[in-house]
Amino acid sequence: MEAIRIQQAQELNKIFAERNPAILAGDFNAVLSSETMQSLLAEWSDSAGTNSAPTIPAAKPARRIDYILTRPESRWRMITSRVVDEPVASDHLPVLAVLELKTK
């Protein structure tokens, strides 16, 4: 399964190779240290920065597999990013980021 995710990450990097501003968010089913995430983070910035928090399972979060990524880093200003403590709506905790798109 990891091999498929790595291929998908590489394909996303190709699709978004132009330096237009982009946001990629969701459940990646991959922890930060995985080869999948490392492939993505070679081209994308993690909205959590160094403040990553676990997102799953919602009742007792132990792993982070939900992300908000941006690129290119030079076009985005991170205002805030956090995991929201809302364990009822899903089996994952939601991730929230407030971003500002910088003008060229």
Listing of model-derived features with the role each one plays in the protein:
Residues 1-104:
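Active-site regions of metal-assisted phosphoester/phosphodiester hydrolases
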